[in-house]
Design a protein with these regions (language model features):
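Short, strongly patterned local motifs
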Residues: 451-454
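Charge-rich, well-structured scaffold segments of protease-associated domains
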Residues: 1-6, 25, 80-231, 267, ...
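General helical secondary-structure elements
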Residues: 66, 292, 353, 403, ...
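Aromatic (phenylalanine/tyrosine) cluster motif
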Residues: 438, 448-449, 459-463
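Cysteine-centered motifs
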Residues: 428, 446, 456-457
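His/Glu-rich zincin catalytic helix
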Residues: 1-83, 188-294, 333, 337, ...
Length: 463
């Protein structure tokens, strides 16, 4: 019998066993990647189109082309699509990124013939109806206006624009007027250019049967579909970074300020990227990170602060995120630079590095434990142009990095001079009163309430 009073032994995984997908090239040239895993009678189909923000001719074109696929086809109205998918217990997801559009179907195996029929119609014969498009645009405009009043939204988009510039797809800021320029013909032209059998790939994951594979081959692999079978050009853009060190966005009614600090970083194919991930995790990538331990736990300037690398084609964006009271903005930024100095000058203690290793290896194990998460991993690897050994290389980087390497990487890639500071909120001219450390604040509150409860008990005992 298991003795639950004894803590299980902690051990590092030697290597992660991540099965590779089986690849079949169908008659029309579409690659079909198959991950047959799991016991539940459910499958997920991901159809990827190489057509995102990088390829669009105007802002929002790629996003709304993808978003409108479910709003009506030659065979099904938007209501019929929603009703039938709900009836069969299926789920459809549509999303768009820098270079790709994703059309994802979750379906029970026993209803796969019915749901695949709807899926095929969505992919091959959308209508982009004007009425439905108008409703969606109005809804998105309202959401955009709501977001535009939030300090975190304003700070984030200002940072990306400051780092990449107006001529870069990442740095182009969407305005309210851009929504009004979207119409069915704009979406149809983007669809005709990029949504075709010569520009897509399919991933099939879950409890996959040969019957499911045959159905996909029949519907999507037997004949070419679409109008323009040219592969998209590989576009490259040069960031035009602003010379301003700090940008302030005034929000006079803001109760707190959003702070974003960022700069250009490595893309995922750089030889140092995997070890820089360890550095950034140590810096601000998990709850026990340097930024959290100092700025949240010790200083109490914020409820949460984090750092991470946002991946884009040909580059990455290192971002530090936090929200704080208006009077503590300067103190918070000062401590961020202090933590960078520590990483550049001091060696990381062995115990702290071991904790980061355990966190990152455990997170990797969770990321590859199901058929769908495996599909996500391989989609990420293939769309990023990474080698099949990426997972093995990532584990090796986490396990072998040394404190000396971390210090060298911090000196090379955490450059304080190029780190942009974006603050969105209310200007505060008075000096901040340094708050109690967060843990001490909690203890003080507990002691206060204990005294109150004790005094009440004493009071009632006398009377």
């Amino acid at each position: 019998m298991l003795d639950r009073t004894i803590q299980p032994r902690i051990c590092e995984p030697e290597q992660l066993a991540v099965p590779s997908p089986e690849c079949r090239v169908m008659k029309n040239g579409i690659p079909l990647y198959i991950l047959n895993a799991g016991d539940n009678e459910v499958v997920r189909i991901d159809l990827l189109i190489e057509g995102g923000r990088w390829q669009q001719n105007q802002r929002l074109q790629a996003l709304f082309t993808n978003r409108m696929l479910r709003e009506g086809t030659r065979r099904y109205s938007a209501a019929a699509i929603a009703e039938k998918l709900d009836y069969y217990g299926a789920w459809l997801e549509l999303s768009s990124s820098s270079e790709y559009a994703y059309i994802t179907l979750y379906s029970l195996n026993k209803y796969l013939p019915e749901t695949l029929d709807i899926f095929e119609s969505i992919v091959k014969e959308p209508l982009f109806p004007e009425k439905e498009l108008g409703v969606i645009i109005d809804s998105n405009i309202q959401q955009f206006l709501v977001n535009s009043s939030k300090v975190d939204f304003l700070a984030h988009r200002t940072l990306i624009n400051a780092v990449y510039g107006d001529t870069h797809p990442c740095g182009q800021l969407v305005q309210k007027e851009d929504y009004h320029l979207i119409n069915p013909s704009v979406l149809q032209s983007f669809y005709d250019r990029y949504y075709h059998s010569g520009n897509c790939s399919i991933y099939l994951a879950g409890k996959v049967s040969e019957d499911a594979i045959r159905r996909i081959e029949t519907l999507f692999g037997s004949e070419p579909f679409g109008k323009d079978f040219r592969k998209p050009e590989k576009l490259s853009y040069v960031p035009v970074t602003s010379s301003e060190k700090r940008i302030f966005i005034e929000r006079a009614d803001a109760m707190q300020s959003a702070v974003r600090m960022g700069m250009l970083s490595l893309d995922r194919r750089h030889p140092d990227y995997l070890k820089v991930r360890v550095l950034v995790t140590l810096f601000g990538g998990y709850f026990g990170s340097r930024l959290m331990s100092n700025i949240r736990e010790d200083k109490g300037y914020t409820y949460g602060i984090s750092a991470g690398i946002m991946p884009y084609p040909d580059s990455g964006l290192l971002v530090v995120n936090a929200e704080t009271a208006n009077e503590f903005v300067e103190l918070l930024i000062k401590e961020v630079y202090h933590e960078i100095d520590r990483l550049q000058n001091d060696l990381v203690p062995a115990e702290e590095l071991a904790m980061v290793r355990n966190y990152m290896l455990g997170d990797m194990c969770r990321s590859y434990e199901s058929a769908f998460s495996l599909a996500d991993a391989w989609i990420f690897i293939h769309t990023s142009g990474l080698p099949d050994s990426y997972v093995r290389d990532a584990v090796e980087a986490v396990k072998t990095i040394t404190p000396v390497e971390i210090r060298e990487l911090a000196s090379r890639y955490l450059c304080k001079e190029t780190l942009k500071e974006i603050v969105s909120g209310k200007k505060c001219h008075k000096k901040g009163v340094i708050p109690l450390p967060f843990s001490r604040l909690i203890v003080s509150l507990c002691k206060y309430y204990i005294r109150r409860v004790t005094s009440c008990c004493v009071y009632t005992s006398f009377y």
